[in-house]
Amino acid sequence: LKKKSKIKLQNNNNPPELIKIEDILNKMKMTLHYSENLSRLTALKELQMEEDNDPFKILIGTILSARSRDENTSKIVRKLFQKYKNVIELANADVNDIKSIIHSIGFYNTKSERIKQVSKIIVEKFHGIVPNKIEDLLELPGVGRKTANCVLVYAFNKPAIPVDIHVHRISNRIGIVKTQNVKRTEEELIKIVDEKYWLVLNSIFVMYGQNICLPIRPKCQMCNLKDICNFYTNQKKN
């Protein structure tokens, strides 16, 4: 089926209207452009823009980024790969050494084990090369759809929609979808967002979620999307 290029918004206070996802992304970028004290690029975007654009480094960065601040993720990724230059070295690393390097990041015990396991599987099953198919990525321990989709987008430039808490929250607030979890949000976004926007959607939504559409006390007055935002409308009522 051909992807729809327009999205029907579910605003409870206005008649349904059609709006291009391009308009939403452009309004987000405009708000971010004129925002003060803007945080830097997301950790994954920074890794993508590095000269080597190493898929393995992006995979490990994605694993480390779960429930971690981007600035901390970037710092830990750099520190980890200063010691272990490639997948083979990490596959042979002592888990306790990995823990000592990433201990300042959330869930470092679990993540250290995951990094070691993932590295060994990539060496033994995929000949040291990070797979570029979602089915193969999902076989890796601790790798779910969000992580797999992030690797596809940021490492291989393959169209996918990584849905994290920011993408899920914003999509529901502005009425693009009406879903209860990230899995359903991804399913709905795939249906209604033109594939040509899949590569950029995550990075823009995440930046917006980190800086403007915060989970608590969002900066609604700065937002160019408040006219279609159910959250903002409900806040005004109260």
Q: What is each model feature region?
A:
Residues L25-K29, H168, I190:
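Generic solvent-exposed, charged/amphipathic alpha-helical segments
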Residues I165, Q180-K183, N224:
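Short, charged hinge/linker segments at domain and secondary-structure junctions
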Residues N172-I176, K191-E195, M207-N211:
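Short basic/hydrophobic patches in alpha-helices and adjacent helix-turn junctions
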